[in-house]
Structures are given as C-alpha cells and as structure tokens.
From Swiss-Prot:
This is Imidazole glycerol phosphate synthase subunit HisF. Keywords: Amino-acid biosynthesis, Cytoplasm, Histidine biosynthesis, Lyase. PANTHER family: IMIDAZOLE GLYCEROL PHOSPHATE SYNTHASE HISHF, IMIDAZOLE GLYCEROL PHOSPHATE SYNTHASE SUBUNIT HISF/H IGP SYNTHASE SUBUNIT HISF/H. Its main location: cytoplasm. Gene3D superfamilies: Aldolase class I. It comes from Shewanella sp. (strain ANA-3). GO terms for biological process: L-histidine biosynthetic process. GO terms for molecular function: imidazoleglycerol-phosphate synthase activity; lyase activity. It is found in: Cytoplasm. The gene is hisF. Signal peptide: none annotated. SUPFAM superfamilies: Ribulose-phoshate binding barrel (SSF51366). The active site is at D11, D130.
C-alpha cells in the first residue's frame, strides 16, 4: 500500500502567506520561506503553494520566492497561480518546483492540460478544482478565479464532469478544494470526496475542513484519498505534523515517518 501524504498548503498573496475562511477575508499568517522550512522540518511529505490572485489578475506566480523555497527545503513542492503556457510552466520547474498546478487557466482552456502533459509528463501536472456545494440544486459546481472574491464566478461545469474531463486530458493528480468547508475546521467533506474518489483513477488530494487529527484519519479511511491537504491547523500550530503522523500510524494508516 502506498503511504498516505500530509500536505501543508500555503496561500500566497502580495509576497506573504495568507489564510481565509471559505476563500474570503484573508489574513497574513507569515513569511513564505520560514513557513516552508518549518513544515519540511516537522515532517511534511510535500508542500503546495497557491498564488491566489494570479489568475484573477492575469499574471503568473512570482518566481523569486520559488527559487528561495527550493534552496531551503528538501521535499517536493507544487506551485500554482496563473500558469497558462508551456513556457511559464517550464520556467517554474527550472526554478525548482517539482510539480505545477493549474486551476482557473484550465477552465478557460482545457487543452492546456494535455499540452502540459505532452511536454512535461503526467506526473508533474496537478489540477486544482474549487468545488462548491449548491444546496438549492443539491449539486457540486466548479468555481473559477476564487482567489479574488470580486472576480470569482461559477462555471458551467459540475464537479463530477470536470473531474472526468481533466483525467481524459492527462492530469497526474487532482486536488479537490471543497469551498464550503474551507477554513472552518469542521472536517473534510467525506460525502463529496467519496463520490469523486469513485470517478478518480489518479491520486486524489482532499482539501478543506481539517480541524483535528481525527479528521485526517476519517478522510483517509472513509474517502480513501491519497493525501490530505490543510492550512490553518498547521499555520496556527493547532496540529504538529510529526505528532499527526504518529497518531495516524497508531490508527493503522500507512504513513511516511
């Protein structure tokens, strides 16, 4: 059995790490490189960095901090933010990123996924999906440009359909960002993640809702995800990554120590 992964997420805005609740009201939580180094030292399996306003503001993730992170940590990391071309992706990988993630740009141009996969291989292409549960229609819908509240818009895609589409086009992993759960620390959306797991033949990373160690256990056991991403519980030192891994191992979950 492949070991499950613990993945701290660092949302970046104006050169700082920030965190919001349900993708709104972001507050500064720290500097990029020291936080990355701290999580690597605690035992994170990899890191994800989102330049959250890049796509909405039509720019690409800032490469200067990418190279500084690469110099300081020895675990894989993924970067996202406004990546729309092969050249932009190549530059970020050259600066030290191990994977690149695309979200809003892929919704604008789905062919970007297959072009990136053809150029760099499936293994380093991650697709982020911002999924919102719409109670009125009892359905999961994909939103775009979520890093800027004023620019956020609903797309024509239902989450399940987009999950299938991005796999057909060649993505290597999917991060499902459950917007309703984001930052509230009430637990992962097991129901939605389990539904997506049935459709997902590539590694699936759960994002949104972690508040306790049991939430991590439950999402691994019940939704059978490959990795669990979290932000605020790590930023605010509510959960220590090393202690979390010891707990999960004691619960019988295969985890890298």
């Amino acid at each position: 059995m492949l070991a499950k992964r613990i993945v701290p997420c660092l949302d970046v805005k104006d050169g700082c790490v920030v965190k919001g609740v349900q993708f709104r009201n972001h507050e500064i939580v720290g500097d990029i490189v020291p936080l990355a180094a701290r999580y690597a030292a605690e035992g994170a399996d990899e890191l994800v960095f989102y330049d959250i306003t890049a796509s909405a503001h039509d720019r690409v993730v800032d490469k200067s901090w990418v190279s500084r992170v690469a110099e300081q940590i020895d675990i894989p990391f993924c970067v996202a933010g406004g990546i729309k071309t092969i050249g932009q992706a190549r530059e970020l990988l050259a600066f030290g990123a191990d994977k690149i993630s695309v979200n809003s740009p892929a919704l604008s141009d789905p062919s970007l996924i297959s072009r990136l996969q053809d150029e760099f291989g499936r293994q380093c292409i991650v697709i982020g999906i911002d999924s919102f549960y719409d109670a009125a229609s009892d359905s999961y819908k994909v939103k775009q440009f979520t890093g800027d509240e004023a620019a956020t818009k609903e797309t024509a895609w239902y989450t399940q359909d987009w999950v299938e589409e991005v796999q057909k086009r060649g993505c290597g992993e999917i991060v499902l960002n459950v917007m309703n759960q984001d930052g509230v620390r009430g637990g992962y959306d097991i129901k939605q993640l389990s539904l997506v797991r049935q459709l997902c033949d590539v590694p699936l990373i759960a994002s949104g809702g972690a508040g306790t160690m049991t939430h991590f256990r439950d999402v691994f056991i019940e939704a059978k995800v490959d990795a669990a991403l979290a932000a605020s519980v790590f930023h605010k030192a509510i959960i220590n990554i090393g202690e979390l891994k010891q707990y999960l191992a004691a619960e019988g979950i295969a985890i890298r120590q």
